[in-house]
Amino acid sequence: MVQCSNNLLGILNFFTFLLSIPILSAGIWLGKNAATECERFLDKPMVVLGIFLMFVSIAGLVGACCRVSCLLWLYLFAMFLLILLGFCFTIFAFAVTNRGAGEVISDRGYKEYHVADYSNWLQKRVNNAKNWERIRSCLMYSDVCSTYRTRYASINVEDFYKSNLNALQSGCCKPSNDCNFTYVNPTTWTKTPGPYKNEDCNVWDNKPGTLCYDCEACKAGLLDNIKNSWKKVAKVNIVFLIFLIIVYSVGCCAFRNNRKRSW
């Protein structure tokens, strides 16, 4: 049992070390070669994660295989913090994604979205001008609206209104249903005389670099995407936490065995 727990911990940490190499390499590569704010946004978290996994796995590997109790203690402490952070993140993710859903529009195949329907924490993220400028840049360089424009370019207005658009397409690539603009094609609409009850109608522009990227509906569409993504991540994180707890338990056995051998 003594040898088994140490060997198992060594094997698990060897694979974790191998995993850290491509994560760290990808983060460094993104930092040097990123073409957009979207890509640059990911480089630092990936570098930090890669370095953390590398050092923790080395500590666990050496501590288990060479029976160095102080390294195993540091490893277990880091693992405990990781489990605690993962647990807190999972609770937080479920808490901030428990609100928000698209509004069903009569005679429309798509929904429309409103920032006020989502949690206050998420609202603050998109209402921050600096944050939104970076996100807006990401959306412009992505294929969200270009794919939407290509896919629906040849359909008439009746078929367009029946289209099942996703949250970003509905919020960022077309004007709000409240505007009652005249349809020309998916990204070209003729404005009707104001005033408008929805401020997004004033923001809309047919220019490909503008569209509705600064609309509240676009922010809400992004929040709906984040909400759905975070719920999926939180569910996966539960499985990951179970795995970490198992590894932590094996580490505790190895640490206890090392202490017994030293006595």
Curated annotation (Swiss-Prot):
It comes from the Eukaryota. The keyword Protein transport does not apply. It is a multi-pass membrane protein. Keywords: Glycoprotein, Membrane, Transmembrane, Transmembrane helix. One of its GO terms (biological process) is auxin-activated signaling pathway. The lineage of its organism: Eukaryota, Viridiplantae, Streptophyta, Embryophyta, Tracheophyta. It comes from Arabidopsis thaliana (Mouse-ear cress). This is Tetraspanin-7. May be involved in the regulation of cell differentiation. Glycans are attached at residue 180. It holds the Pfam family Tetraspanin. The keyword Heme does not apply. Residues 1-7, 67-75, 256-263 are cytoplasmic. Residues 29-45, 97-234 are extracellular. It is found in: Membrane. GO terms for cellular component: membrane; plasmodesma. The chain crosses the membrane at residues 8-28, 46-66, 76-96, 235-255. Belongs to the tetraspanin (TM4SF) family.
